[in-house]
């Protein structure tokens, strides 16, 4: 018997990445999840997942948490569904100029949300303290800049942004 591939849970999957991962025969199980998108494999509330503990080796969560009022609960749930040693790759809008994350649940006006949080449906703009939030969930956290992995040429070629990706190991 060959070694089983890694099981991946992908929240609000980007079409191009989803297509590539679905065709990756080296993966074990690849599952897409979203609260309401009809094309998702499963419909999940990221703050209260109906999945067993330790179900996945990898969780991909790019530009999701800024939409979730209870982001810390979502982080706990991500940690819960990861197997020991599993890794979540989390990306959020980040403003390094902020002393701390800007969030205010009383802000419901779409124009004010766009002004403060960068988009009408965001509930916060993360500051550098996102790293502490992730660590306080129990993750071992490493900040990764894509340019440090693929280089500036590849970044330009594929039109990638150099936004921090948080590598969060359980």
Predicted regions and their residues:
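Class I SAM-dependent methyltransferase SAM/SAH-binding core
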Residues: 3-48
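An acidic- and aromatic-residue-enriched active-site/binding cleft used to recognize and process polar
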Residues: 35, 61, 93-95
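Activation segment
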Residues: 39, 50-53, 68-69
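A short acidic, Gly/Pro-enriched loop at the edge of an enzyme's catalytic core
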Residues: 46-59
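A short SAM/SAH-binding and catalytic strip from SAM-dependent methyltransferases
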Residues: 57-69
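S-adenosyl-L-methionine-dependent methyltransferase catalytic module, highlighting the catalytic core
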Residues: 69-78, 83, 87-170
């Amino acid at each position: 018997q060959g070694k089983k591939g890694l099981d991946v849970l992908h929240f609000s999957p980007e079409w191009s990445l989803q297509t590539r991962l679905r065709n990756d025969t080296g993966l074990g199980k690849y599952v897409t999840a979203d609260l309401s998108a009809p094309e998702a494999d499963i419909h999940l509330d990221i703050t209260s997942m109906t999945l067993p503990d330790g179900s996945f080796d990898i969780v991909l969560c790019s530009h999701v948490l800024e939409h979730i009022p209870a982001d810390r609960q979502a982080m706990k749930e991500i940690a819960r569904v990861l197997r020991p040693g599993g890794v979540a790759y989390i990306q959020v809008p980040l403003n390094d100029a902020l002393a701390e994350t800007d969030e205010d649940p009383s802000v419901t006006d779409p124009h004010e949300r766009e002004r403060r949080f960068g988009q009408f449906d965001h509930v916060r703009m993360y500051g550098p303290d996102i790293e502490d939030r992730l660590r306080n969930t129990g993750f071992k956290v490493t900040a990764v800049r894509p340019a440090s992995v693929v280089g500036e040429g590849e970044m330009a070629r594929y039109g990638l942004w150099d936004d921090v990706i948080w590598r969060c190991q359980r």
